[in-house]
C-alpha cells in the first residue's frame, strides 16, 4: 500500500515557498483585498502548543482560499514580545530579557514554518524592536498632546511579588493577579492613566457596526457599564459640607434611610466625629489592603463604620446616618451611595446587620423578610405615590432639577486605563519631568526613546521601575540648563498589541506609522481570529487607540476589526482517581481499554481538561509534525468539530486524519487519470466544489473536510478519474493540506508553479441535479432487483424497463402476471401467480 512521505514532501515545499516568496502580499489594485489576522503570540520559553495552530490554520485556509479566488491577501505574523515572563526569567537567571526573547522568537518561527502557514514574513513585527515601538511611543505622545494621557495619584492594584501595579482587568475574581496568582493590595501611587472613559459612548455604540460574537459584545457592554439615572446632592447636617450620589433609581429617594461613603472618599475625615475617629481610621486601614474585586464580592459579610455624622435627605428633610463601607468604591460613580434597604439586597443586608431603618417605597413584598427588588407602584413617597417606575423617575428628576439638588446623569462603569508599570521590560514612556515642575513629551525627532541595556533589572523597591537606577539614561539637561529626569515607568504589554495590525500594512515605513493610502486600501481587518479570553482587555484597548487615531486622521475607519472569530480550546486528556484528584499522565497505564494508576493500581476515570505542564498532558506540535506530518495536524484540528467548540485531543482522531490523507495521495498517484469524463462523478464532484466553497467561506471547516471525504469514497469506486476532477479536488484540499496539495498538483500538471494562485474551481449548477434515480423491483413483496433509470419516467416506461430486466425475467419466467404497479422514481411491484 502506498503512503506519502511527509518528512520529504513538507520541508521541500516550505523551502520552495520561502525561496520564491510565494505568499508576498498582493498589490494589484484591480483585485479585491482580504486581510486575515491572527492574534500574535507572546513568544514564551515553552514554545507553541497544539492550541496555537487551531486559529492559525483557520486563517491560513481562508487566506489560501481567497488567494485562489483572486484576492490580494494580507496574512502576517509577529511577536507580542514585551511582558513580565521574560523579565522574571531574566531576574531568575541573570540573562538579558532581549536575548531570551530572541531565542524564543526563533523557536516559535521554526515551529510555525513547520506547519506550512502562508505568512508574508517580509511584514513580521516585533513589539520590542525600537523601529516598532518608536510608533507605540509616538501614539503615546499624541494621547498626551490631546490630554488623553495624564498623571494621577491613584489607588492601584499593587502586587509586591511582581514589583508592579496592574490594571483592574488583570485582577482575578479571587483578588489575586492574573499573572502568577499573587495577592493584590490597594496602594496610592503616581501613575500614568489613559482617558478611555472619554470614548465610552463610542466604544458602546460602534459595537453595532461589527460582526462579532454577541457574547463578546455583551462582555464589552457590561465592562463599559452604561447607566442612566440622576446625581443627588446630600448636605451634611450642621456643616457646610455636601456630597453627591449617583443613582439609577432616583424615584426611591423617599426610601433612602442612610448613606455610605467609600473609605477613601475625600469627605470622610472632615465629617468624622471625634468619638468615631479611631474606628474610622482603623476601618480605612483594613479596606486599603483589599482589592476592588474582594471588596465588592456579593457573598462576603457586610462591614462598615458610622462616621458619627448625619446627612439630610433632600426630598423629605429627614436626617440619615452617614457610614463608610468597603463595598463602595471611590473609583466608581461618585464614591458615595444613598442606601434604599427596602429595595436593594446589599443595602438590606447592611441595614439588618447594623439595625438601620428599612422603609418600603414600592408596593408588593414584605421588606422585613427580604428586599423587594421588583417593580411596583410607589408608596410612602409623597408626590410620587401611585406612579409607576418610569413616570416616577421622570417626575423625581424634574423635581431635583427644579429644587437645585440634583440632575439627570449618564455614568459608566468603565474606569480610565492604568497605563504605567514599574518594570524594566517594556516601552519607555517618552516623557521628561523638569526640575521647574513642568513635564514635556520627547519630541518626535528623538523617537524612539530606546530602552537602555542594563544588568540591574530588579524592581527598585521604591515603587519606581529599575530604570530609576540607570542614571546616565535617566538624567537629562535642556539647552537652557534646566535639569530633568526621564519617566521611569514603562508601558504595559497591552500597548504594542493595541495597534500592531496597522504596522503590518506598512512595516518598514520610517517616516510615519503607516502610509494613508495603504491604510485606506487594507482597513478594516476582514477576519480576526483569537481566544475569547481577550474579549475585554486587548480588544477594548485596540478599539480605543483606533478611535483616537481615527480622530487624528491617521486611520480611515472607526473600527479596526470587521469580523471577529473565537476558536475553541483544544483540551488535553486528564485522569481522576476515586477522590476526584487529578493524576499526571506519566502515572497512568492503559489495560484492556481502561486506565489505571501505575503505583496504586486504582482504575481511573478519563475526562477532558485544559492542557497543563503539571498534568503532563501538553501536546507539542513538533512531535505531531515529526510522526504524522503538518498536513495531518492541520486537517485533524479542523476536522475535530466546529471551530468555536472546545474539544479534547485524540490520538485516534489524528491517526484517522493521516489515513485520510494517505487515501488522497493514493487516489491521485495510483488511479488512472483520464481526459475522458464518464459522467459517473459529475454530481458528487460539483456538490463537493459547491459545499467546500460555501463552508470554507463560513469557516465550517469540519463539514468541508467531511465533503472531501465523500468525494474520495466515490472516486475510489471508479476505475478511472477524470483529469479536471482530479485537479479540482487537489485545489479544494490544498488549503487544508498545502504540502500534499502542492505535491499532487505537480504530479498532475508538472507545471513547476505553486498551486497557490491557480483560480479556485467552479461548479456546474446543472450537474447538481440528479438525472438518474434508483428504483426497486419487487416480486411478491420481495426486492428482486434494483435499477438505475432516467428520472421521471412514466408508469408505462418504468414497467417496460422493469419487465425487460434479466433478473426480473428469470423470476417471472413461466408465471402469469396478474398486475404491475409502477410508482415513478420509486418502485415497480409485480404480482404473479
Curated annotation (Swiss-Prot):
Its EC number is 6.1.1.4. GO terms for biological process: leucyl-tRNA aminoacylation. ATP binds at residue 613. Pfam families: Anticodon_1, tRNA-synt_1, tRNA-synt_1_2, tRNA-synt_1g. It catalyses: tRNA(Leu) + L-leucine + ATP = L-leucyl-tRNA(Leu) + AMP + diphosphate. It is found in: Cytoplasm. A motif ('KMSKS' region) lies at residues 610-614. A motif ('HIGH' region) lies at residues 41-52. It comes from the Bacteria. The keyword Ligase applies. Belongs to the class-I aminoacyl-tRNA synthetase family. NCBIfam families: leuS_bact (TIGR00396). This is Leucine--tRNA ligase. The gene is leuS.
